[in-house]
Amino acid sequence: MMKACGFDIGLDHPFFLIAGPCVIESRELAFETAGRLKEITGKLGVSFIYKSSFDKANRSSGKSFRGPGMDEGLKILADVRAQLDVPVLTDVHDIDQVAPVAAVVDMLQTPAFLCRQTDFIRACAATLKPVNIKKGQFLAPHDMLQVARKARDAALEAGGDGNNILVCERGASFGYNNLVSDMRSLAIMRETDCPVVFDATHSVQLPGGQGASSGGQREFVPVLARAAVAVGVAGLFMETHPNPACAMSDGPNAVPLDRMAELLESLVALDRVTKRSGFLENQFV
């Protein structure tokens, strides 16, 4: 079990939610989505972390919108955190960003493409902030054991207890411009002894599928989210937007903000059943 952002994280507790727009488009959008998500999760009793990126460093096209940049983005996230009283998360992309970002946010996130960059992963973990490490689309779930060990060792060397690492499944490459989610990976990644998070929106992404941008199949977000909750996860990650068709990044796989309450309500009910029933995979070995 981990305690982070003021709540307990683990399979002995209800799932927590990381959610928000893919990228910080404006201060107004950040406050609109964070405020609405706080209201929804508060009614459902779901622990919530607001997420949005200040820079999308791996866009398909060099001409695509990347975000407001680190300085402006962190100001917006700090204001959301202070004024709405919600914990915040954002991703970092290189070692130079780690310290200034860690000074503002409650949880760091590392991009899937960078999960094998040892010095980068160690730098994030050494902040002793919770770190959500996304599994690369190219990586087998059991390979996350070594990634988690690198991170945990760095945290221990920095004087922490090594209990600040989460691992996140976001789909595996399946041919060109496609991802598939192997639900076995959620159980396999438990072997890291880290809380496992499932990214239900990037898992339906079609990387580069629109040529200059990625496509997506948001209609399958509920399918995969329910499957993951039925397997059993510590947390869910879902990007959402008031108008996905107009989103400046990852709109095709974003959940419409006005559908989040309905989706989360069904997931909360399923999570209760799953965790009340227990986890049986070790009994079949």
Swiss-Prot record:
Its EC number is 2.5.1.55. It catalyses: D-arabinose 5-phosphate + phosphoenolpyruvate + H2O = 3-deoxy-alpha-D-manno-2-octulosonate-8-phosphate + phosphate. Pathway: Carbohydrate biosynthesis; 3-deoxy-D-manno-octulosonate biosynthesis; 3-deoxy-D-manno-octulosonate from D-ribulose 5-phosphate: step 2/3; Bacterial outer membrane biogenesis; lipopolysaccharide biosynthesis. Keywords: Cytoplasm, Lipopolysaccharide biosynthesis, Transferase. GO terms for biological process: keto-3-deoxy-D-manno-octulosonic acid biosynthetic process. Transmembrane segments: none annotated. It is an enzyme of class 2 (transferase). It is found in: Cytoplasm. Its main location: cytoplasm. One of its GO terms (molecular function) is 3-deoxy-8-phosphooctulonate synthase activity. One of its GO terms (cellular component) is cytoplasm. Belongs to the KdsA family. This is 2-dehydro-3-deoxyphosphooctonate aldolase. The lineage of its organism: Bacteria, Pseudomonadati, Pseudomonadota, Betaproteobacteria, Burkholderiales. The gene is kdsA.
